[in-house]
Amino acid sequence: MRVLGIETSCDETAAAVVTEGGDVLSDVVRSQVALHAPYGGVVPEVAARDHARAVVPVVREALSRAGVSAADLDGIAVTSRPGLAGALLVGLQAAKGLAWAAGKPLVGVDHLVGHLLAVFLRRGGAPLSDERERPSFPYVALLASGGHTAIYRVDGPALGAIRELGATRDDAAGEAFDKVAKLLGLGYPGGPVVDRLAAGGDAAAAADAVPALMARKESLEFSFSGIKSSVARHVAKRGRPEGQALRDLCAAFQGAVVDALVQKTVRAARAEGIGRVVLGGGVAANQGLRAKMAAACERRGLALFVPPLASCTDNGAMIAYAGALRLAAGERDTLDLAPETRTALPRVTRKGGGAR
């Protein structure tokens, strides 16, 4: 089975052709980072307009690289939720038009489910029998990105087999990285810059600038708004740091965020009695997170599965794969499929403060 996946939920226009076994035949991503950088974040109207310009050429390139035509496809998958309404609508309209014209089945995919299953993608011609880097169900997954941060128990690929164990009460981890980077004058997107600077910093030298982020509390919930405010107060009092002081502050900030992500994910795996941990989402590309999660899992005898960088950030391949599994299960959507800004995965974490 060969499925085309289309992803336009935020600021990447992406399309890919993937088999139901997870083999990536093509994967094309057009980033909008340069368009949004002057604004310090994603502008929904700008995103939707650029998706409208890019989606058809990106889909054509994905089909061409895979060596297939629309007639060769077994189905078309598209991100239908969650995301920016206008951006989602562009991808949906493109997918619907192609599905109707080619007479192919259409399936909508929850963007978060795509991230949670991205670990199963095989890139670069890996042997079909090579399962060393693929987990078995169930596993505990940390999904951390610019819009979402949550820990899930994943018992299978279906929506009903995925359960949230804990999530952020306010900002997502990636959002915190971008906001702190903006405070420090590091530009957008901030995550990669902070990660690079943190590698040369001493977190202890700036420990007074950041709080501990609930890392030691038993709850599996996160809160990242406080650390942003703490850094803002630090900068307001002392000015924007430069040189080694900047690297130290980045190291302290990143260390606090990563410690919370790692400790709570490991705690969730042990509480669920599951020995497999998966990382997903754009923040999973952070080298500090990868290193600390690997060390923590090794100490506790947990098997860690981390997708390659191309599978962590938004991409069409994860949407195509999740869609292929839906198609293989006999599921279909109609041309009435509409965009939804919220995930279909049930939430257990309340936004805002207060005890659960």
Curated annotation (Swiss-Prot):
Catalytic activity: L-threonylcarbamoyladenylate + adenosine(37) in tRNA = N(6)-L-threonylcarbamoyladenosine(37) in tRNA + AMP + H(+)
GO molecular-function terms, A-Z: iron ion binding; N(6)-L-threonylcarbamoyladenine synthase activity
E.C. number(s) listed in UniProt: 2.3.1.234
Protein location: Cytoplasm
Gene Ontology CC annotations of this record: cytoplasm
UniProt binding sites for Fe cation: H111, H115, D314
Pfam families for this protein: TsaD (PF00814)
The organism's place on the tree of life at top rank: Bacteria
Binding site residues for substrate: L143, A144, S145, G146, G147, D178, G191, D195, N286
Cofactor(s) needed by this chain: Fe(2+)
Record's cofactor remark: Binds 1 Fe(2+) ion per subunit.
Main location: cytoplasm
Alphabetical list of InterPro entries matching this protein: ATPase_NBD (IPR043129), Gcp-like_dom (IPR000905), KAE1/TsaD (IPR017861), TsaD (IPR022450)
Keyword Cytoplasm in record: yes
EC top class named in words: transferase
Any one GO biological process: tRNA threonylcarbamoyladenosine modification
Keywords assigned: Acyltransferase, Cytoplasm, Iron, Metal-binding, Transferase, tRNA processing
Classification via CDD domains: ASKHA_NBD_TsaD_bac (cd24133)
Function comment: Required for the formation of a threonylcarbamoyl group on adenosine at position 37 (t(6)A37) in tRNAs that read codons beginning with adenine. Is involved in the transfer of the threonylcarbamoyl moiety of threonylcarbamoyl-AMP (TC-AMP) to the N6 group of A37, together with TsaE and TsaB. TsaD likely plays a direct catalytic role in this reaction.
Family: Belongs to the KAE1 / TsaD family.
PANTHER family with a match to the protein in the record: TRNA N6-ADENOSINE THREONYLCARBAMOYLTRANSFERASE, TRNA N6-ADENOSINE THREONYLCARBAMOYLTRANSFERASE, MITOCHONDRIAL
Protein's UniProt name: tRNA N6-adenosine threonylcarbamoyltransferase
Organism field: Sorangium cellulosum (strain So ce56)
Gene transcribed to yield this protein: tsaD
